[in-house]
Amino acid sequence: MPKRAAEDQKHPAETSSEDEYDESYLEEDSYAPDSPDDPTMEDDEEVPDTIDVDFEYFDFNKDIDYHAIGNLLRQLLDSDSTSFNLSELSDMILEQESCGTTIKTDGKESDPFAILTVINMSKHKDNKKGVIAALIDYFVARTQDLPELHKQMRKLLGPSSTSKVGLIISERLINMPVQVVPPMYKMLLDETKDQDFDYFLVLSKTFTEAETSVDEEDERPSKKNKKGPGYKPETYYFHPEDEVIQEKSTQYGSYAFKKASQEADSKRAFQEYGIFPQGHLMLFKAKDLEAIVAKMEVEFAP
């Protein structure tokens, strides 16, 4: 049975030409469109812009979700994912049976298309060889160019800190509609009320538009070249709900990944531009989660 039957929703799943995320755990053939040469296709047949999909909300399933969680974590951490023991992190997520939510479209035994959970970083930080300690060191190192956030990372996640910080992990396939997110956060709010967190730290991603080396090799004129020497690329959210979270955050900021990504050159995204992904952290007081959820429900109503 679904985790919250009342939360089951039908939404149009947006189709996308950008195959940005790794969906290797899915059967590619089952998602491949018919070939234009297929004689069964009519000449005037059009591919629909949206497809109605029933989304169901479930608890994490130890027997089914392990590999899909690993894939989604790799998407979230991008090119730096190889720096962490994602098997340990996946196991940690699955062990929290009463905390966190997955979204599936084909019943409990199918792979999740989205996950949301929180991990008590303060509980695991003293295990110096563990994945949480590695993430803490990573966050401290990557935020050195973000002084206020860096200061809070050292203060709240340091060895002598008594603050209880929950790491919120949220990731989904790129064509999942944002309207599925508020119910997940509402359930997380209910599930964490008795855990007495002081702060939540959201691990996410943003991106900027970056000119690709392929364009440079082709010597094509680029819009970016017309911006002038003082041009600073605009930052965009992968997850629209992050804008709501950021409004309530005490500190936040984007940071460059340690390992360079080839995503922009391989995808030729936005035609003349590539996508330059970067990590993003948002820190907010736990008491503000209720207000965040309330605004999400308004901003992203079904």
Curated annotation (Swiss-Prot):
One GO process term, biological-process aspect: protein transport
Entry's Gene Ontology cellular component terms: cytoplasm; nucleus
Record keywords, A-Z: Cytoplasm, Nucleus, Protein transport, Transport
Main location: cytoplasm
Renumbered residue ranges of the record's region Disordered: 1-46, 211-232
InterPro entries: BCP1_family (IPR025602)
Location(s), subcellular: Cytoplasm; Nucleus
Lineage top rank: taxon: Eukaryota
Keyword Cytoplasm: yes
Biased composition (Basic and acidic residues): 1-13
Pfam family, one: BCCIP
Keyword check for Disulfide bond: no
Biased composition, class Acidic residues, residue ranges: 16-46
Functional summary from the UniProt entry: Involved in nuclear export, actin cytoskeleton organization and vesicular transport.
Family: Belongs to the BCP1 family.
Protein known as: Protein BCP1
Organism: Yarrowia lipolytica (strain CLIB 122 / E 150) (Yeast)
